Amino acid sequence: MMMNAFIEPAQHHLASYGLRMSPNTTASNSNAQQQQQQQLEMTQQQQQQQQQQQQQQQQDQESAAATAAAYQNSGYGHFNSYASRDFLLGRREAEYGVAGSAGQASAAADSMLFSGFPAQAAELGSGFGQHPFHSHHHHHQMRMGMADAYAAGHPYNHHGNFPTAAVHHPVVHHPSHHAMSAMHPAGAGAFLRYMRHQPASSASSVKQEMQCLWIDPDQPGLVPPGGRKTCNKVFHSMHEIVTHLTVEHVGGPECTTHACFWVGCSRNGRPFKAKYKLVNHIRVHTGEKPFACPHPGCGKVFARSENLKIHKRTHTGEKPFKCEHEGCDRRFANSSDRKKHSHVHTSDKPYNCRINGCDKSYTHPSSLRKHMKVHGNVDEKSPSHGYDSEGEESSSSSIITGGAQTPPSTRLDGSAGSSSGVSSLSGGSGIKSSPHSIKSEPNPMHSVHLGASSSGSSSTASSSASHLLQHQQHQHQQQQQQQQHQQQAQQQQQLTAHPSDPKSSPALQLMAASASAYLPPPLGPPPSHHHHPHHHQAAPSPGAAAASASMLHHNHHLLYHPAAQHHPPSDWYHTTAPSGSAEAMNPLNHFGHHHHHHHLMHPGAATAY
């Protein structure tokens, strides 16, 4: 430090010497050298960092080019544009300092380029799996649309690193899923159309073999149809078999018989009038369709040139066939449509409904098809309603008329000589019917248990009495009915045996009438084909057989043959009108019968009424 001589000596005791003190330059020089060294070191570090960045960029370029070249050789050359994009992404990530080291900075580009495919360059293995934010366990959540939850901490949000996933799980769970998600992180569907195409080599490797089944017509009558000699030559293309048929079997101008001898042909050897018609017919057996539609994007093919000509009019809009009726300007693309339309102007209705009982007819087949839907909506099927035209046989699958029921074609009418009250007016409606008159065909089940006739249409008193006697023979083998039913049945037997007994009181007669109305007479065991566990009581006296013959037969149907078996739910059961006698059936007797003997019948029988 230099002292000034003019300073007051009281304050500075060295001023009397007149000396000027200079600062120490050694310390300042050392500080300057240290600063220079630090600057040099910083400069060197910056240069090293720049060199490392340049080297990293070169490595990124080389790795991207190598990966793109590898996938170009494996058939995915249309993804070359990803190389430049991934290089820029890797450079951007290095600039932001996302990677922790120079080796980690190269992982961004590597994880983007189809890591799910097996074709990988050997020098790329070191860079896989080093992405700082990679997490294999989040891979499937990313693919399921949960990437938003991880986008905040992840700059690029690509988790398709397949080799790192292999570190966690050596066995690949879904290799195709990894591949598709790696190709397009936003969604694999954009590239699905490229994956579905089969290679041309596999399509060409499948050989189409066709066999000629033409029968040798030299001696067709001497050999049985199953033993005729066939050609059986095998061809590998449509052109080969068509050429073979044309040359070997159809023949040239010298052949005058134009008949098809293909195995199973429906023409049965009937010849054609011209050779070209036979050639067109053979295409039915070979499946050849040489006439393709030239319209772009149509792709339809046809076996006949006429059909192609008609089809072309759908593209051009041409309608050369004008309606021949005066005053009608309708035009059509083909003559068949014009013919269908021509019936509109005439009274002809050639398209008839073939359902039995339906007399509808229409001028156009489309109207008939709409009408047939009415019949098709009916779920019930009856064997008595079938087709009655064109020689077609009726089948059990034919449908009945929808909406209203058809009139009954056959009724189970009683004979004229049956017992009293069998045939009478039904409920005062004026319609003559028997107790078994239904709106359906007779069921074969009636003939099983009647034993007198196959259709069950004659139920006389003698036949009912024979049934009763037959039931009496089995009465000793049965157990007695419950006591309550037995007492009621005994009362009914007494009143039935002596209906005009003057000793009977009016109250007892009223009770007997009600009992006879609601309880059937005791019956014998059912036939062997029924499995109802009934128990019947003792039989009535033989004198009551003739009086209750018709009622016995009626109740026999109700007991052993539930109405659900032979009476459709929509059919009404016609009963006889009530008479003055106590033994006559009440029109409501089947309701009471179901009430008292519901345990003897099928659960679904009561719903038939």
From Swiss-Prot:
For this record, the Gene Ontology CC terms, alphabetical, are:
nucleus
According to the UniProt record, where is the region Disordered? Answer: 20-41, 373-550, 583-609
Tell me the compartments it is located in: Nucleus
Question: Where does the record place Low complexity bias?
Answer: 414-434, 449-498, 538-550
* Superkingdom classification of source: Eukaryota
Composition skew (Basic residues), residue ranges: 528-537, 591-601
Q: Which GO terms describe its molecular function?
A: DNA-binding transcription activator activity, RNA polymerase II-specific; DNA-binding transcription factor activity; DNA-binding transcription factor activity, RNA polymerase II-specific; RNA polymerase II cis-regulatory region sequence-specific DNA binding; RNA polymerase II transcription regulatory region sequence-specific DNA binding; zinc ion binding
Q: Name one GO biological process term.
A: eye-antennal disc morphogenesis
Q: Where are the zinc fingers (C2H2-type)?
A: 210-249, 258-285, 291-315, 321-345, 351-375
Keyword check for Zinc-finger? yes
Role according to the record: Transcription factor essential for parasegmental subdivision of the embryo. It is involved in the activation of wingless (wg) in odd parasegments. It is also required for the timely activation of wg in the remaining parasegments and for the timely activation of engrailed (en) in all parasegments.
Q: In which tissues is it expressed?
A: Expressed throughout all segment primordia; expressed ubiquitously in the ectoderm and mesoderm precursors.
UniProt keywords (A-Z) are: Activator, Developmental protein, DNA-binding, Metal-binding, Nucleus, Pair-rule protein, Repeat, Transcription, Transcription regulation, Zinc, Zinc-finger
Which species does the entry assign this protein to? Answer: Drosophila melanogaster
Q: Which protein is depicted?
A: Pair-rule protein odd-paired
Q: Does the keyword Repeat apply?
A: yes
Q: Which family does it belong to?
A: Belongs to the GLI C2H2-type zinc-finger protein family.
Composition-biased stretches (Polar residues)? 22-32, 399-409
